[in-house]
């Protein structure tokens, strides 16, 4: 099976530093769930851009940090993940954490949804948090 690509796009002025490190980490996280890498796009945007998508496609009149459109086929993960960098920054401030740490959590949250993990019930949320922590621990940057 041909391996897909993980790509990063920006609809605002956000620039993801160390793109290849993030790509390698996401690939490692996907493989750790015994899944395959299809074409996955992360699209960074602002609150208004994501709010418009939330209204148009999900009929939700709320701001959110992430919306994922899952096109996974079998065990091959693919789809589009929209992330509001404004909301990530606000969450980082609220949770007293660094922007990069909160961004990792949101990035991997979308991937975990593609892997089949849900977060509607309290039990599902607890498992999602554990999985997020497990995958964040896989992120290593060589200095």
Swiss-Prot record:
<feature type="binding site">
    <location>
        <position position="113"/>
    </location>
    <ligand>
        <name>Zn(2+)</name>
    </ligand>
</feature>
<keyword id="KW-0479">Metal-binding</keyword>
<keyword id="KW-0862">Zinc</keyword>
<dbReference type="GO" id="GO:0004222">
    <property type="term" value="F:metalloendopeptidase activity"/>
</dbReference>
<keyword id="KW-0540">Nuclease</keyword>
<dbReference type="GO" id="GO:0008270">
    <property type="term" value="F:zinc ion binding"/>
</dbReference>
<keyword id="KW-0963">Cytoplasm</keyword>
<dbReference type="GO" id="GO:0006364">
    <property type="term" value="P:rRNA processing"/>
</dbReference>
<keyword id="KW-0255">Endonuclease</keyword>
<dbReference type="InterPro" id="IPR002036">
    <property type="entry name" value="YbeY"/>
</dbReference>
<keyword id="KW-0378">Hydrolase</keyword>
<dbReference type="GO" id="GO:0004521">
    <property type="term" value="F:RNA endonuclease activity"/>
</dbReference>
<comment type="similarity">
    <text>Belongs to the endoribonuclease YbeY family.</text>
</comment>
<feature type="binding site">
    <location>
        <position position="119"/>
    </location>
    <ligand>
        <name>Zn(2+)</name>
    </ligand>
</feature>
<feature type="binding site">
    <location>
        <position position="109"/>
    </location>
    <ligand>
        <name>Zn(2+)</name>
    </ligand>
</feature>
<dbReference type="InterPro" id="IPR023091">
    <property type="entry name" value="MetalPrtase_cat_dom_sf_prd"/>
</dbReference>
<protein>
    <recommendedName>
        <fullName>Endoribonuclease YbeY</fullName>
        <ecNumber>3.1.-.-</ecNumber>
    </recommendedName>
</protein>
<keyword id="KW-0698">rRNA processing</keyword>
<dbReference type="GO" id="GO:0005737">
    <property type="term" value="C:cytoplasm"/>
</dbReference>
<keyword id="KW-0690">Ribosome biogenesis</keyword>
<dbReference type="Pfam" id="PF02130">
    <property type="entry name" value="YbeY"/>
</dbReference>
<comment type="function">
    <text>Single strand-specific metallo-endoribonuclease involved in late-stage 70S ribosome quality control and in maturation of the 3' terminus of the 16S rRNA.</text>
</comment>
């Amino acid at each position: 099976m041909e391996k897909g690509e993980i790509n990063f796009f920006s609809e605002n002025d956000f620039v993801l530093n160390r793109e290849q490190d993030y790509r390698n980490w996401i690939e490692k996280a996907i493989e750790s769930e015994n899944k395959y890498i299809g074409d996955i796009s992360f699209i960074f945007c602002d609150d208004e851009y994501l709010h418009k998508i939330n209204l148009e496609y999900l009929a939700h009149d709320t701001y959110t940090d992430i919306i994922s459109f899952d096109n996974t086929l079998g065990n091959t993960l693919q789809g589009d993940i929209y992330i509001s960098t404004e909301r990530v920054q606000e969450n980082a401030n609220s949770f007293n954490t660094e922007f990069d740490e909160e961004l990792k959590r949101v990035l991997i949250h979308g991937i975990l949804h593609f892997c089949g993990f849900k977060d509607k019930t309290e039990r599902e949320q607890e498992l999602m948090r554990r999985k997020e922590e497990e995958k964040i621990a896989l992120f290593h940057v060589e200095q």
